[in-house]
Amino acid sequence: MSILENFDPAVAHAIRVETERQEFNLELIASENFVSEAVMEAQGSVLTNKYAEGYPGKRYYGGCHNVDIVENLAIDRAKELFGAEHANVQPHSGSQANMAVYFTVLKPGDTVLGMNLAHGGHLTHGSPVNFSGKFFNIVPYGVTKESQTIDYAEVERLAVEHKPKMIVVGASAYPRTIDFAAFRKIADKVGAVVMVDMAHIAGLVAAGLHPSPVPHAEFVTTTTHKTLRGPRGGMILCREEFAKALNSNIFPGIQGGPLMHVIAAKAVAFKEALSPEFKQYQQQIVNNAKALAVALMKNGFKLTSGGTDNHLMLVDLSETPLTGKVAEEALDKAGITVNKNGIPFDTRSPFITSGIRIGTPAATTHGLKEPEMAQVAGFIADALANVDNDAKLAEIKGRVNTMMKQFPLYSSRLA
C-alpha cells in the first residue's frame, strides 16, 4: 500500500481509476496528451516546496540557487527549440501567457483583431466572457463559408478599417496550416503588433512540421502540454527588445511566485522535444490525423474544411440527427474521449454544438499508428450509429479496451 493509499484512500482511488481510464480508454481530445515518467518525476519533486519570486539571479527569496539552475535550463532549451531571442517559462497557463502579452502591448480599450471563438479561436482571443473581451475592443475575424479556412482578405479589410494595435493569430479548433507571413504583412500595413498563440501546434512547430511563427511575430505564446507533451503550463517567446517589459508583466504584473516544480517538468519536456525521437513522434501525430480523417470520411462523416493539415479535425454533425453533446456522451460510454465543439457558422449553443473535435497526440503517445486509425474510425462510426443502445456501446468499449491493452503506457502504475 502506498503512502497516499494509506493516508487518503479516497484521493488514491480516484487517481487509480483515472490512471485506468488513461491506460485503457481511447483519448482523442486534441488538447490532451500523456507526459513521460521523467516529466512526472520532476513535477512531483521537492521543488514544489520552493518560493522563488523574481527571475534567476534576481529573486526576492534566499535559497534559490538550485531552482535558478532549473529555470535557466528551461529558458535555454525553449530558446533553442524554437529559435527565439527570449523565453519566459513562468506562466501558469496559456491564458496567463496571453494576458501578460496583452498587458505588455495594450491599454484598456485598445483595439485587437482576434479569431472568432465560434470559428475555431480561443476564449482569450477576445471572447466577451473572457478578460480579453472585457478589457479590450475586440474585432473578430473568421473563416470563409466556402472553404472553412481563414479569410485572409477579411482579416486585411478589418485591419485597414479598424487599425488594431495588435493582431492575435492562432486557434483551438482549426485543422489547417496558418499563414503567419500573411498576418505579418497585414499587420505591417496598419502598424500592428502580432501575437501568435501556438498552443495547439507547438510540438509540430518544434519538429518543423508547421511553419514557425517566431520570425513573423513580436510575441509567441503557447501551452507546454498539448502537442508539446509537457506539464500543464504556459510559456512566452518574444524579441529581446520586449523582454524586460514582458517579464515585469508576468511578475509582479499578474503572478506571484512561479511553480518551480512545473518549470522543472517544462525543462525536462523541452529536452525531450529537442530529440530526434520527438520529431518522429510529431510526424506520426500528423500521419495518424490524416489517416483518421480519411477513414472517418470513408465512414460517411463530414469534416470541416474537408480534412486536416495538423493534429486535429472537426467532425461536422449538422446534417445528421446527432448533436456534439449526444456524440460526446455516446463515445464516452464506448471508452472514447472527445469533446463537443462548435463548427463554423454553428446555429446550436456551445453547450450542445453541431460538431466534435478529435485529435491524435495522446493516442500517438500510446503508440497507435495508421492501421489503428482505421479501427478507431470504425469504433466511432459504430458508436454514433448506436447512441441509444447502451449494451452496444459497452460492447464497443470492450473492443477499445482490448486494443489499448496492446499499447501500454502507465501499466507500471497499475501493478
Swiss-Prot record:
Family annotation (Pfam families): SHMT (PF00464)
Keywords: Amino-acid biosynthesis, Cytoplasm, One-carbon metabolism, Pyridoxal phosphate, Transferase
Catalytic activity: (6R)-5,10-methylene-5,6,7,8-tetrahydrofolate + glycine + H2O = (6S)-5,6,7,8-tetrahydrofolate + L-serine
Keyword Repressor: no
Gene Ontology CC: one annotated term: cytosol
Record site feature (Plays an important role in substrate specificity), residues: H225
Cytoplasm recorded as keyword: yes
Amino-acid positions noted as binding (6S)-5,6,7,8-tetrahydrofolate in the UniProt annotation, renumbered to this chain: L117, G121, H122, L123, E241, S349, P350, F351
Modified residues (N6-(pyridoxal phosphate)lysine): K226
Family: Belongs to the SHMT family.
Protein function: Catalyzes the reversible interconversion of serine and glycine with tetrahydrofolate (THF) serving as the one-carbon carrier. This reaction serves as the major source of one-carbon groups required for the biosynthesis of purines, thymidylate, methionine, and other important biomolecules. Also exhibits THF-independent aldolase activity toward beta-hydroxyamino acids, producing glycine and aldehydes, via a retro-aldol mechanism.
Quaternary structure, from the entry: Homodimer.
Protein name: Serine hydroxymethyltransferase
Organism: Geotalea daltonii (strain DSM 22248 / JCM 15807 / FRC-32)
